[in-house]
Each structure stands twice: as C-alpha cells, then as structure tokens.
Amino acid sequence: GILVFLALYPAIDSITVWAQAPLTVPAVRPLVPTAVATADSLFFSMEPLASFRRLEARVDIAPNDYEARWRAARAALVLGVIEEDRERTDRWLRIAVQHASEALALQPDNVDAIAWLAAAKGRLATDIAGVREQVRLGQEVWALTQEALAIDRNHAFANSIFGKLN
C-alpha cells in the first residue's frame, strides 16, 4: 500500500510525502479556508463537476457555510444545464434547488441566495417538470424574483431571471 510506496520512493521533502498520503477530515480541516477559492477557480476553469465535489466536501464539514452552499447550487445548476441525460439533469437541478434552499435558509435576506434559488427552480420548471409542477415552480420563481428585486431592483441576475418569466 501507501507505506510500501513511501518506503521504496522516499520524497524529497515532507510536503510531498504528506500530499501522497490519503487525506482525512482532520488533515483537510486546515485547508478549509481555501476550499471556496479553489472551487471558484475550478468553476471558472470550466470544471463545474470538480468545483461541485470540492464544495460538497466543504458542506459535509461545515453545513452552515453560506458561501459554499450557494456556490454548490451554482455548480449543480450548470451541471444540470450541460447534462444530456434527462434523469441526470433532473438530479442535478434538484441538487441545485436543495443547496440554494439551504443557502437561503442561512441568509434569508440575501438577494444572491434568492436569485440562485429562483434560477434553479426556473431551470427545473423549463427542463424537467410536468405541467402541474411547471405552474407551481413558475409561481415560486415569480415570487422569488419579486422578493429579490424588492431588496435590490437593479440586481442583474434577478432581473435576468424575471425577464425569462415574461
């Protein structure tokens, strides 16, 4: 296993050896402050799945991390949009709704949280939902965008979502 590898191929420095060992939750805790920044870097490097996985690991360690939650919603939403298989699209979009809902529960007046939840529900309505669920989700998206725009009438993302409703 890993001990044989380390014994046969000694590392030049201790950092390399540490990186070769399996990471555990206690080992990852010191790296947590960089988790969101790393996830953003992965996301903007067109790697939404790697970003989502990093954020999911962060949420497992710190479920009340608002920043990780909304970013996980964003990554899952993009994964749902680019997925070609209908079942996997449905799963990703519902994961996006869940993370966005959790983010909103953590910061109920945060316009970004409201907008990401509206976007996730809106995409679910247009891509997956049946007629009844489309109507319900459409009403929820309308209410969420109204709530977001009441907080910040110039919020670009909320206005974009609202524009798609009309």
Give the location of each predicted region.
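Extreme N-terminal leader/anchor segments
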Residues: 5-67
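Short coil/linker segments at helix-helix boundaries
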Residues: 30-56, 72-109, 115-154, 161-166
